[in-house]
């Protein structure tokens, strides 16, 4: 067909033929310009091909000081056969791996940020999983930090706990043995509330008493379950018992507020995802989670849970006489007889994740809903926008932005959303902006900034939009610039510059002042905070945060600032701080369940939400929420229905 006089021809065999020839060139070492050294094995390839398939290698090649020479990339913790399989995939789009190598291919794909391959390998493992391999697969998924894979494996274990508990891997797990003494005519409840109290007791023992988890497992621990459904420490039954939970506690397992001296210990925990295939020592994240439970015989219960990042069996045995001293606790053996009673309560309903993983996104609360816009999901810069309905615990799409953008912030001004600057994934910085009208469900352009701005803070104050700081054109250092947009005159003006250059700072309004929190001057993270007074157009340095951070989220609740997560120069952070402007001081709060840098934070219905971000390994679509009244973070939706 020749429309308009032009010849158009499509060779359907060209692509297959070309990639086959390119792969042959690779195997013969012809025209190769990159050498991969994997545990003593040398693999040759073409830089352009690998850069298209691996964002990790793209970043390395893009920063190569000698772009026209041969690149050398060294891996000491990957399987050479797995990397060769990924190279074949990069050239042929065909993934062929023996079942014994799938975990190694997954690990290599994770390191190279080949997310599609990682997902395919994960799905394959799920298809082969049975009761015998479930624990092994869960350990692997946990150490890889794959929330999607973990969720599916945990669902399988919940449905097949009886069969799983009879397998060797399960029987080798660390075991916490609890003797729970009961008042007369009481039985232990077969539901999650009991295990919530138990996990709370373990956390308290570790964090307040400094008791190592291993020591708690050395001997039987005695607790007391009273008639009013309180779980008490059995060693304190002489009238000084401490209550560890009540019947109306939420069924949730969250990281409790640690003592001040433990904060720095938590921050130093590595969340690296670099794993050596076949290694048994993987750096797993700290986690507290109830997975599954079953009632066995004679008031005995079995629970699988994660305690401080360790997969454990909690074995509970109830005795009817509180005064009796337990002489023994039944041991879990392969011959245990189960009654097979179902759980009396359904598993906790989690906060629904976004449709897309997003880091460097814009977050705002508008019309009793949370709005998440743009961001990176590793593969691309997004322009999609999602809306969270707290009543239905669901995310739906609204009109997408006109321009893909990430590394920006979003603000609400006069009932509309505003986004300014950022990056579109191709150009480092944007000067354009948009505003969203919720009534029309559409985005329209607003006058551009005078200069391109990426990683700038955005805030509404006195019916005007402020854009503060950001990166210079080279992205190497922060800016002091502060620009103001008037939505009535649609004009930009300048205001006083910051005292300190900042990019990736958290920005918000509180009580008629604008706060600019943390960020980085160049690559050095800041803990300093500045406050802007629009009455006299001045910036004042106020009390500094406890932890220097950039890429943190910030939210305002009841006259205080809450700063969540961020990056300290080495690690994505879990820690949270609160600023009291009356006292001009910062206080550490309970940490989030996941580390999050470049996440969004917003308040809805008296609850602070942390959304998306990057945990040091993966881009996140997950959501967790903080109840300021209880000072606890949770991923459980039901925990906030009455908030």
Swiss-Prot record:
Its main location: cytoplasm. The keyword Cytoplasm applies. It comes from Danio rerio. Kelch repeats lie at residues 369-415, 416-463, 465-512, 513-559, 560-606, 608-643. Disulfide bonds: none annotated. Residues 257-282 are annotated as: Disordered. Plays a role in cell division and in the dynamic organization of the actin skeleton as a stabilizer of actin filaments by association with F-actin through Kelch repeats. One of its GO terms (molecular function) is ubiquitin-like ligase-substrate adaptor activity. The keyword Lipid metabolism does not apply. GO terms for biological process: proteasome-mediated ubiquitin-dependent protein catabolic process. The gene is ivns1abpa. Gene3D superfamilies: 1.25.40.420, Kelch-type beta propeller, Potassium Channel Kv1.1, Chain A. Residues 267-280 have a biased composition (Low complexity). Residues 32-99 form the BTB domain. Keywords: Cytoplasm, Cytoskeleton, Kelch repeat, Nucleus, Repeat. It is found in: Cytoplasm; Cytoplasm, Cytoskeleton; Nucleus. This is Influenza virus NS1A-binding protein homolog A. Transmembrane segments: none annotated. One of its GO terms (cellular component) is Cul3-RING ubiquitin ligase complex. Residues 134-185 form the BACK domain. PANTHER family: INFLUENZA VIRUS NS1A-BINDING PROTEIN, KELCH PROTEIN. It comes from the Eukaryota.
């Amino acid at each position: 067909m020749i429309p308009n006089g032009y010849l158009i021809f499509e060779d359907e065999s060209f692509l297959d033929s070309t990639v086959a020839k390119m792969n042959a060139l690779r195997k013969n070492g012809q025209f190769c310009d990159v050498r991969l050294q994997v545990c003593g094995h040398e693999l040759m390839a073409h830089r352009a091909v690998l850069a298209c398939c691996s964002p990790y290698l793209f970043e390395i090649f893009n920063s190569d000081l000698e772009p026209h020479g041969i690149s050398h990339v060294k891996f000491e913790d990957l399987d050479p056969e797995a990397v060769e399989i990924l190279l074949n995939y990069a050239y042929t789009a065909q993934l062929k791996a023996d079942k014994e190598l799938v975990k190694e291919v997954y690990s290599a794909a994770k390191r190279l940020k080949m997310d599609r391959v990682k997902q395919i390998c994960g799905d394959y493992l799920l298809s082969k999983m049975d009761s015998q391999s479930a624990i092994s697969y869960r350990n692997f998924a946990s150490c890889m930090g794959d929330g999607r894979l973990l969720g599916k494996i945990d669902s399988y274990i919940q449905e097949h706990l009886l069969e799983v508990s009879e397998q060797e891997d399960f029987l080798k797990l660390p075991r916490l043995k609890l003797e729970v003494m009961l008042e007369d005519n009481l039985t232990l409840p077969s539901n999650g509330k009991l295990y919530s109290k138990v996990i709370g007791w373990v956390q308290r023992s570790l964090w307040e008493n400094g008791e190592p988890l291993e020591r708690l497992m050395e001997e039987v621990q005695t607790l007391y379950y009273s008639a009013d459904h309180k779980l008490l420490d059995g060693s304190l039954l002489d009238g000084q018992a401490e209550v560890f939970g009540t019947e109306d506690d939420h069924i949730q397992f969250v990281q409790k507020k640690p003592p001040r001296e433990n904060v720095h210990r938590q921050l130093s925990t590595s969340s690296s995802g670099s794993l050596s295939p076949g290694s048994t020592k993987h750096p797993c994240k700290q986690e507290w989670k109830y997975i599954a439970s079953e009632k066995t015989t004679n008031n005995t219960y079995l629970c699988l849970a994660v305690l401080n990042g360790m997969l454990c069996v909690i074995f509970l045995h109830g005795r009817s006489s509180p005064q009796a001293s337990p002489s023994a606790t039944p041991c879990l053996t392969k011959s245990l007889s189960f009654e097979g009673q179902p759980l009396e309560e359904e598993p906790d309903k989690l906060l629904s994740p976004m449709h897309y993983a997003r880091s460097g996104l814009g977050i705002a609360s508008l019309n009793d809903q949370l709005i998440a816009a743009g961001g990176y999901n590793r593969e691309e810069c997004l322009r999609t926008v999602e809306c969270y309905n707290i009543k239905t615990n669901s995310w739906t799409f609204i009109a997408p932005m006109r321009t893909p953008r990430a590394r920006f912030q979003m603000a609400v001004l006069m009932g509309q959303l505003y986004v300014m600057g950022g990056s579109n994934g191709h150009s480092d910085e944007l000067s354009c902006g948009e505003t969203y009208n919720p009534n029309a469900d559409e985005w329209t352009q607003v006058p551009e900034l005078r200069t391109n701005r990426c990683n700038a803070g955005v805030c509404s104050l006195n019916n005007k939009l402020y854009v503060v700081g950001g990166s210079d054109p080279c992205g190497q250092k922060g800016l002091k610039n502060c620009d103001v947009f008037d939505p009535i005159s649609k004009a930009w003006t300048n205001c006083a510059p910051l005292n300190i250059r900042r990019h990736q700072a958290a920005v918000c309004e509180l009580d008629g002042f604008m706060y600019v929190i943390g960020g980085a001057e160049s690559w050095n993270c800041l803990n300093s905070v500045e406050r802007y007074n629009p009455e006299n157009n001045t910036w004042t340095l106020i009390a500094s945060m406890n932890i220097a951070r950039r890429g943190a989220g910030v939210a305002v609740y009841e006259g205080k600032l809450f700063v969540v997560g961020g990056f300290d120069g080495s690690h994505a952070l879990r820690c949270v701080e609160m600023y009291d402007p009356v006292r001009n001081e910062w206080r550490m709060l309970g940490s989030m369940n996941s580390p999050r840098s470049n996440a969004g934070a917003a308040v809805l219905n008296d609850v602070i939400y942390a959304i998306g971000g990057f945990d040091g390994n993966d881009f996140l679509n997950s959501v967790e929420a903080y109840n300021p009244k209880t000072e606890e973070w949770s991923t459980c939706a039901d925990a906030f229905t009455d908030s």
